[in-house]
């Protein structure tokens, strides 16, 4: 088979990088929001996991949830409510639909989360698998938060980090 060129080519372990030609940013506020999560390591070994939402027009950080456990689907639903209330006050349903762009993490793609999003007027959208650049705005925010806030502020324990998060996000905005 080798002599006749019939063997399959060996896999070298690297993946072909997915090229993203789409556009995350939009020209008007409240058209598309993006969300992602990150982990902050504390000096004492604790980890704080944070999920956040940004407007894809003005990049405003509109809401966040933080926990020392894993981010759950319920946390993401709470984030959706907090984000909607941040922009529009207490409403049951958005007047016009807004896209909610996220990766394919289990809390985001959970059936209850997607149904809840549609019930309040959000349109859940996910990025292609293995394509973090498709949610580049959220990925850039993660890098900014870690570089400009986490690295230069004390992070002795989870409680301190969780208490500082609102101040960091206010300063970012």
Where are these regions (language model features)?
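Charged DNA-binding/catalytic regions of mobile-element recombinases
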Residues: 1-173
């Amino acid at each position: 088979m080798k002599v006749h060129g019939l063997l399959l080519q060996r896999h070298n372990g690297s993946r072909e990088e997915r090229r993203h030609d789409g556009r995350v940013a939009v020209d008007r506020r409240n058209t598309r929001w993006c969300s992602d999560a990150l982990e902050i390591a504390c000096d004492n070994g604790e980890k704080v996991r944070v999920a956040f939402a940004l407007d894809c027009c003005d990049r405003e950080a509109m809401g966040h949830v933080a926990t020392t456990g894993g981010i759950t689907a319920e946390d993401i639903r709470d984030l959706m409510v907090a984000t909607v209330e941040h922009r529009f006050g207490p409403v049951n349903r958005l007047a016009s639909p807004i896209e909610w762009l996220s990766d394919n993490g289990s809390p985001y793609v959970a059936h209850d989360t997607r149904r809840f999003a549609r019930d309040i007027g959000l349109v859940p959208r996910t990025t292609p698998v293995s394509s973090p650049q498709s949610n580049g705005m959220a990925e850039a925010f993660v890098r900014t938060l870690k570089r400009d806030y986490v690295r230069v502020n004390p992070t002795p324990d989870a409680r301190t980090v969780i208490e500082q998060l609102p101040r960091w996000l206010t300063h970012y905005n």
